[in-house]
């Protein structure tokens, strides 16, 4: 087929299909994987929105394009996308590229099935069951339930819904009008999905009682006890506490044993949002950070974050063995969940979720785990802690780096103090001027494509950087580069 000809439908032409896919895979390997993970290449190729629209030629037209043009489209998509597998990408709680997980993602997309019944996803139903069993065992449960969800936010929302249903099962049929005012409790450092979940589930954000956190970002159990008493005095019914293991900004781990004691005294559902910190359970050295997690009723854990399983890979784990997920979320659609099937219908998982179609998220994690084993994944976690500590110690040797606090996880939070502000901490406008530094440096690094680091204000603190040390390909040289690059970018400030 000539390059100038429009690409016809490939249906029924296996030779053409193979040729196209081999060509596309070649582009992916060259551009997204080899270049996208090389320190000799940029993390991103920044373009302003209008320029990017022109470069991509986004308009969808009546006529198709040639195979040559399609391959150029693929190259352009990769070229102008952020390379999250790059060793200099420190911007989010996910980074890196695991080849076995990527292989699992490719297979998943190729098979294009929905994980709601055993009859159309037999391999993945059994695989998901085994992966969830393994995750529960790491939490400390010998039995239980669980499901893969489309992100940690949904896992957290499911936990709230399950806790409400367990206490008031009539609400599934009769709705909110049957409920008294409810109260749930979480730290001010919690993920924003708790507030969004309360709104989405009809509880309202006023039902979320915000518990104090200490100077390190950990929930204060004494204030939790106080907030529960206040809610009851106001006529609300407490039903859930959401603790956090690995907060988004500071990387704090709530004191789960003390929080579990409070929940036990008051008969409250304990949910642990371990979306970020759950993978620490794989480390014998560091799993003490989650001591008490086995006392939770539910746990959210995102292996797509620290384990780099690839977006998305988010598990909700339950200690419950009463089929609570299906009772709460099920609707028994007769065209999917026939009860007279030729196999054990308990294998059909679709009624555990509020979705109908559900993508397969277990294969990438299973394949990576098969390749790495517990020991390989543990080394990955431990190395992240080692490199985070290396970065902190190197910062202390240099002028111009001020830690927000000593990290206990792999979130390293700090200010870069440029030359013009050094020694001027007592100036009345010092903090205001310091807060303006991170946005300027972020713009410079992104537009050069040298690296990406996130920043944010936090409480009374002005903007500071948060480096996430999670990519298993990182070395001490990458940590040194980060510090050197900040010094270079900020030398004139």
Curated annotation (Swiss-Prot):
It is an enzyme of class 4 (lyase). This is Cysteine sulfinic acid decarboxylase. The lineage of its organism: Eukaryota, Metazoa, Chordata, Craniata, Vertebrata. Pathway: Organosulfur biosynthesis; taurine biosynthesis; hypotaurine from L-cysteine: step 2/2. It comes from the Eukaryota. Homodimer. One of its GO terms (molecular function) is aspartate 1-decarboxylase activity. GO terms for cellular component: cytoplasm. It comes from Homo sapiens. Keywords: Decarboxylase, Lyase, Pyridoxal phosphate. The modification N6-(pyridoxal phosphate)lysine is found at residue 305. Expressed in liver and brain. Also expressed in both astrocytes and neurons, but lower levels are expressed in astrocytes.
């Amino acid at each position: 087929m000539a390059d100038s000809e429009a690409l016809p439908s490939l249906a029924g032409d296996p030779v053409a299909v193979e040729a196209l896919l081999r060509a596309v895979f070649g582009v992916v390997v060259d551009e997204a994987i080899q270049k996208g993970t090389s320190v000799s290449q940029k993390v991103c190729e920044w373009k302003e929105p209008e320029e990017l629209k022109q470069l991509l030629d986004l308009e969808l037209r009546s006529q198709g394009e040639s195979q040559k043009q399609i391959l150029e489209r693929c190259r352009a998509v990769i070229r102008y996308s952020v390379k999250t597998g790059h060793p200099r990408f420190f911007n989010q709680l996910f980074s890196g590229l695991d080849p076995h997980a990527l292989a699992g993602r490719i297979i998943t997309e190729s098979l294009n099935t929905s994980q709601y019944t055993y009859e159309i996803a037999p391999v993945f139903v059994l695989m998901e069951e085994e992966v969830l069993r393994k995750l529960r065992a790491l939490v400390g449960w010998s039995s239980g339930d669980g499901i893969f969800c489309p992100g940690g936010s949904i896992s957290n929302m499911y936990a709230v819904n399950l806790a409400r249903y367990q206490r008031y099962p009539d609400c599934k049929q009769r709705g909110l009008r049957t409920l008294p005012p409810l109260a749930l409790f979480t730290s001010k450092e919690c993920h924003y999905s708790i507030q969004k979940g309360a709104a989405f589930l009809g509880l309202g954000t006023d039902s979320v009682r915000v518990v104090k956190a200490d100077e390190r970002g950990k929930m204060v159990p004494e204030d939790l006890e106080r907030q529960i008493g206040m809610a009851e005095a106001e006529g609300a019914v407490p039903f859930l506490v959401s603790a956090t293991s690995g907060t988004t900004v500071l990387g704090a781990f709530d004191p789960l044993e003390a929080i579990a004691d409070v929940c036990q005294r008051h008969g409250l559902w304990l949910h642990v949002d371990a979306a970020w910190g759950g993978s620490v359970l794989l480390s014998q050295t560091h799993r003490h950070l989650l001591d008490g997690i086995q006392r939770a009723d539910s746990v959210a854990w995102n292996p797509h974050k620290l384990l780099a399983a690839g977006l998305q890979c988010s598990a909700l784990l339950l200690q419950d063995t009463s089929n609570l997920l299906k009772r709460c979320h099920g609707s028994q659609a007769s065209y999917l969940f026939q009860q007279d099937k030729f196999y054990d219908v308990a294998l059909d998982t679709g009624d555990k979720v509020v979705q109908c179609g559900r993508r397969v998220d277990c294969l990438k994690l299973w394949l990576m785990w098969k390749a790495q084993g517990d020991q390989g994944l543990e080394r990955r976690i431990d190395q992240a802690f080692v490199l985070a500590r290396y970065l902190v110690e190197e910062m202390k040797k240099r002028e111009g780096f001020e830690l927000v606090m000593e990290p206990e996880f792999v979130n390293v939070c700090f200010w870069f103090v440029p030359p013009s502000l050094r020694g001027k901490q007592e100036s009345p406008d010092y903090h205001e001027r310091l807060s303006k530094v991170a946005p300027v440096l972020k713009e410079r690094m992104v537009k050069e494509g040298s690296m990406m680091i996130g920043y944010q204000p936090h409480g009374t603190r002005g903007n500071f950087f948060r480096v996430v040390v999670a990519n298993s390909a990182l070395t001490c040289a990458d940590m040194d580069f980060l510090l050197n690059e900040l010094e270079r970018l900020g030398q004139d400030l």
